[in-house]
Structure formats: structure tokens, C-alpha cells
UniProtKB/Swiss-Prot annotation:
Protein name: Putative sugar uptake protein M6_Spy1874
Keywords from the named record: Cell membrane, Membrane, Sugar transport, Transmembrane, Transmembrane helix, Transport
GO molecular function: carbohydrate transmembrane transporter activity
Entry's localization field: Cell membrane
Family as reported in the entry's similarity comment: Belongs to the GRP transporter (TC 2.A.7.5) family.
Membrane in keyword set: yes
Superkingdom: Bacteria
Primary subcellular site in the record, as a coarse category: membrane
Taxonomy of the source species: Bacteria, Bacillati, Bacillota, Bacilli, Lactobacillales
Pfam families, alphabetized: Sugar_transport (PF06800)
Organism, as annotated: Streptococcus pyogenes serotype M6 (strain ATCC BAA-946 / MGAS10394)
Length: 287
């Protein structure tokens, strides 16, 4: 039970990143740079307290992983801009879970028993249904929908998902480091990635500074993810953390004024239920 409680913290912190950053404002590049600055400050504070042993391998792969993560985050911020937070985030989380699970099964053979394939396939189907309904648009809401650019949003989500899944595979399947040890090199890579996406034209303005708060949310989520994994297992912790998409949907509607028709709200509730059940089943399969 304690592990589940810890897993709820990254669910709320990571789920809040999208609508908090969009409430602050700024371009996706400014949002990413500000977030990475906040993450770097948080990571430096953790390093000064913990003083973990640092190796060359840890630095190299940590920086590489952070750079790859920045691809995912920049794409997600672009998708939010084009599609809205309440649409982009559940699509992002769902596609990460589905693609990550398929890679785990096909490449790393994480499912070995028949029951895992049965329950796992059901979980993936529920996730696909969930993020389909959570992003489904009502024609009656055309006045709002025309303000969005869903084709650009889906393109941004494509490279965002690839970046996030590559990052997850690197740290979960290929290289296994302690979070408290790798968090500083990773934050350095995140900043380098954000600067690269700004074409090395760094401008520290109010949006960059304010978005550093979002980096603190990312850092707090990582710490509690570590605690949750130690108590309940990584699979359960990760699956629960991905339910942050629910927080994004609610936050986008309540705090960003993203309107939904009654029909869309019914679809959203259906999507959330499918998403919760699918993520929990996936965690059970992986554990």
C-alpha cells in the first residue's frame, strides 16, 4: 500500500507538467529549456546531499539519455500546442505504454507465460481504446476544434513517443543505473538537448525562468518513482505514474479552459476508465 501511495506522487507531478507549463506560457523550446534548468538545479541539490559514486559510463549514458528525453519532451510540448493538453497528454502516455510494451515483448521477451500474453493483450487493447476515446472530437465542437492542428500534433507526438520510448528502453532494459546516481548527468543531457532545439540561441526570459518550476515537478516525480519502485516494483510504479494523463485531462479542462461538449465528456470518462484498467493490468503482467 505504501508503494502505491508513493506511485501516486509522480502521477500527480508528471501529470501536472503539461497544464502548469502551458498556464505559464512560452514557446515549446522555452518551456523545454526552462523545465531542464529546473531539473538541473534539482539534480545538483540531490547530488550535493547524496554524493553518489559517478563513473565515466554513467556520465556518458546519462547525458545521452537526457538528450533523448529532451526530444520526447519537446515533441510533447509541440503536440500540446497543436492539440491541447487534455488531448495530447493521454495520446502521449497511451502510445508510450503500448509501444514500450511491444518492444519489451518482441525485443526483450518480457512476456513468457501464456497468461501474460492474454492479460497483456487485453491491457494493450484497453489502452488503445482509452486514448482513442479520450482524444475523440465531437463535430458539434467544430468552432473550438478548428483552432487546433491535429495533423501537426500527431507528427509531434510521433517523434515525442519515439524519444520517450528510446529513453525508457535505454534506462530500463539496456543500462540500469540508480536514479539518484544518474539524475545529474541526465539533467545535463536534458539541458544540452533543449539548447540544441533552440539552435544554440539561448534567451533567458520570463517564460524560461518561470518554467523552471516545472523541472522541480519532474525531479520530485523521479524521487517518488524510485521510492515506489522499491516498495511495489518498477512495473507497478511506472504503470501508475502513466495515469498522470488523467491529471492532464482534468487540468487542461479546469485550468486552461479547454472546452468539451457533453458527448466529449462521456468519451473522456470512458477513455479514462479504459486507461486506468489497462495500465493496472499492464503493471500486473510486468510484475
Amino acid at each position: 500500500m505504501e508503494g502505491i501511495f508513493y506511485a501516486l506522487i509522480p502521477m500527480f507531478t508528471w501529470g501536472s507538467i503539461g497544464f502548469v507549463s502551458n498556464k505559464i506560457g512560452g514557446k515549446p523550446s522555452q518551456q523545454t529549456l526552462g523545465m531542464t534548468f529546473g531539473a538541473l538545479l534539482f539534480s545538483l541539490a540531490v547530488w550535493l546531499i547524496v554524493r553518489p559514486e559517478m563513473t565515466l559510463q554513467l556520465w556518458l549514458f546519462g547525458i545521452l539519455g537526457g538528450f533523448i528525453w529532451s526530444i520526447g519532451q519537446t515533441g510533447q510540448f509541440h503536440a500540446m500546442q497543436y492539440m491541447g493538453v487534455s488531448v495530447a497528454n493521454p495520446l502521449s502516455s497511451g502510445s508510450q505504454l503500448v509501444l514500450g510494451s511491444l518492444i519489451g515483448v518482441l525485443v526483450f521477451h518480457e512476456w513468457t507465460r501464456p497468461m501474460q500474453f492474454v492479460v497483456g493483450s487485453l491491457a494493450l487493447l484497453l489502452l488503445i481504446i482509452g486514448f482513442y476515446f479520450s482524444s475523440k472530437q465531437d463535430d458539434a465542437n467544430a468552432q473550438v476544434n478548428h483552432l487546433h492542428n491535429f495533423s501537426k500534433g500527431f507528427r509531434a507526438l510521433t517523434y515525442s513517443t519515439i524519444g520517450y520510448v528510446m529513453y525508457a528502453v535505454l534506462f530500463n532494459n539496456i543500462m540500469k543505473f540508480e536514479v539518484l546516481s544518474v539524475i545529474l548527468p541526465m539533467a545535463v543531457g536534458m539541458v544540452l538537448g533543449a539548447i540544441t532545439f533552440m539552435s544554440f540561441k539561448i534567451s533567458i526570459d520570463q517564460y524560461v525562468i518561470k518554467n523552471s518550476v516545472v523541472g522541480l515537478l519532474w525531479g520530485i516525480g523521479n524521487i517518488f518513482m524510485l521510492l515506489a519502485a522499491s516498495k511495489a516494483g518498477l512495473a507497478i510504479a511506472f504503470s501508475f505514474s502513466q495515469l498522470g494523463a488523467i491529471i492532464s485531462i482534468v487540468g487542461g479542462i479546469l485550468f486552461l479552459g479547454e472546452t468539451k461538449t457533453k458527448k466529449e465528456m462521456r468519451w473522456v470518462v470512458t477513455g479514462i476508465i479504459c486507461f486506468i484498467v489497462g495500465a493496472i493490468l499492464l503493471g500486473v503482467v510486468k510484475s
